Structure formats: C-alpha cells, structure tokens
Amino acid sequence: PGGNDSEYAEFFFSIRGQMLNNRAAANRYPDGKEDFKNIYGDWFAYNFGVKDGYYYRGAFMDCVQAVRFMATRETSDMTQLFAEGSSQGGALSYAVAALSDYPFTAIAPCVAFLGDFPDYFNIVSWPAETAKANKGSMTNEEMYAFLSYFDTKNLATRISASVIACSGLQDVTCPPHTNIAPFNNLPTEDKVFYYYPEMGHEIPADWNKKIMAFFKERMK
C-alpha cells in the first residue's frame, strides 16, 4: 500500500541496529545530538550460541513490539493484519506471524532468509562460514539445535495466516530450498508459491502487485 491508500494503516519500521536505527543524529532531526548506531556488528554473529541474547531473538521481538504499538493506534484494525518483506524481511514476516499476540490475516515473504539451516549450510558458504567461525566449543549438532529457535522452517508451524511467497531459482544468498522448507511446513491450505526461474536474490517486478491483490482478496 501507499500513503494515500485509505484501506491500510501502514507501519514501516527497522529492527535494532539497522536502517532507521543506524544513522547520524543530523539525519534524524536538525538539532539531534545522539547518533543511532549499529552496536551489534555482524548481526548473524552477535551473541551466536546464546539463545536468550542472540541478535535475531531481539530482532524478532522488535517485530512483536511493532505490532503491539500498532494496537495502540486508533486507526489500526487488529483483526486484519498483513506483513510483507524480502530477504531478512521475509524471515521477519514469518517470525512476526508466528510470535505475535495478534493473529495475522496474510503474509508475503519473498526470497526469505533464515530457513532450514542444516541444508542451507550445505548449499552455500554464507552464513555458514560466519556460524562456524563463531560457534566456539559447540558441536555441529549443538549449533543446529541453537539455530532451530530462529529457523523459519520451525516458525512456520505456528502460523495460521494465508501466505504468498516467492523465490528465485538462481538465488545463491537465500536458495530456493531454504524458502520451500518453511512454506511446506505452513499448516494453512491457503498458500501459494511463485518460482522465478531466471531470478537471483531480488524482488520480482510484479511482486507488489501480486501481494496486494492477494491481501485484498482476504480482507474482511
């Protein structure tokens, strides 16, 4: 949706240390005195192996809190919630629908990150190399047990929303299998997956049109 679309109350936000939360004070307001900084370094590596302190635990909770904030707005209809995002945002779409206090109507994850880690790490080198460099004394079995808490394949089992998802078959950042795994675990029968044979890690030109049509068909 856009700012002039009266059917939606749209909330765009950034998780900790990223984008809006990683910029100079002067870029936030004219007399700003405090910079917003990424204090986490490599997000995937931050507190790796610490289940309660890992970066993506906090990032997922940022999404949950964003929904709680929306619930305080008079313009929000909390019976009709939608989420969409690509790459990391695709993973966050799965996470917020799985963990939110409020059920989502539909979500649209595209070329989603954080899916099916054991196979993910066998397919491509990143983020496998980062994980293995930061796993310390953990065995591979222990590492995958830790990562299972943040795996979209497992989060998907908690989602009741309708889902429209997509993947590029040439994607070497978030390969197709890592997108198909969570999609297959979704309990809903109201789900559709689009494959783009020539596409890499990118958003299809027609994607926004597709997801908005999907969302509008499911509005109450």
Where does each model-flagged region fall?
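Hydrolase active-site cap/lid region
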Residues: 92-139, 203-206
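Active-site nucleophile elbow and catalytic-triad environment of alpha/beta-hydrolase enzymes
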Residues: 140-155
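C-terminal catalytic histidine-bearing segment of alpha/beta-hydrolase fold enzymes
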Residues: 180-220
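Gly/Ser-rich "nucleophile elbow"/oxyanion-hole loop immediately N-terminal to the catalytic nucleophile
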Residues: 42-87
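Short alpha-helix in the alpha/beta-hydrolase fold that links the catalytic acid
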Residues: 161, 175-184
